[in-house]
Amino acid sequence: MSRIAKQPIVIPSDVSITLIGQMVIVKGSKGELKRLIHDSVLVKSVKSCLVFSSRINSSVKGWAQAGTARSLVNSMIHGVTVGFFKKLKLFGVGYRISINSSKNLNMSLGYSHIIEYVLPFGIFVESISQAEIIVKGINKQLVGQVAANLRAYRKSEPYKGKGIRYSNEIVRVKEAKKK
């Protein structure tokens, strides 16, 4: 049995949750998110709490899905109230990132051309400097995926430490080959 699924989610006063079959719709001050919950999970709204359980009590997979569903809905509630962000930093001579007028990113990462990245709907980027950006949004998965996609254009390499990395990421620089 999942310990996470047994914990109820307390619904904040500024969030409204609608349950339509297996669809959970969460509305808050920052926006609205929808998610389809697995068929083996039963979601109930009791007072100002959401309770998750397995439809078949003896099913281990049902309880595992209930724990996953609870975590996903909890992230949705956090997203529509506070939001999520990932901070990225660029390390390297001449590496720059800028936001153009159509809210797309232009990245100069040492290639012979400038990379233009089109932001998906619901993702916002804030530029702190030419070498730092913050990816923001209400969908945790989408914010993480966009940050990972941006990082994939030039991952930090271990010899000089050049590339794009998360603000809390530590890159261990290797020693150069000796003669």
From Swiss-Prot:
GO terms for biological process: cytoplasmic translation. PROSITE patterns: RIBOSOMAL_L6_1. GO terms for cellular component: cytosolic large ribosomal subunit. The keyword RNA-binding applies. It holds the Pfam family Ribosomal_L6. It comes from the Bacteria. InterPro entries: Ribosomal_uL6-like, Ribosomal_uL6-like_a/b-dom_sf, Ribosomal_uL6_a/b-dom, Ribosomal_uL6_bac-type, Ribosomal_uL6_CS. GO terms for molecular function: rRNA binding; structural constituent of ribosome. Keywords: Ribonucleoprotein, Ribosomal protein, RNA-binding, rRNA-binding. Transmembrane segments: none annotated. Part of the 50S ribosomal subunit. This protein binds to the 23S rRNA, and is important in its secondary structure. It is located near the subunit interface in the base of the L7/L12 stalk, and near the tRNA binding site of the peptidyltransferase center. PANTHER family: 60S/50S RIBOSOMAL PROTEIN L6/L9, LARGE RIBOSOMAL SUBUNIT PROTEIN UL6M. Belongs to the universal ribosomal protein uL6 family. This is Large ribosomal subunit protein uL6. It comes from Buchnera aphidicola subsp. Baizongia pistaciae (strain Bp).
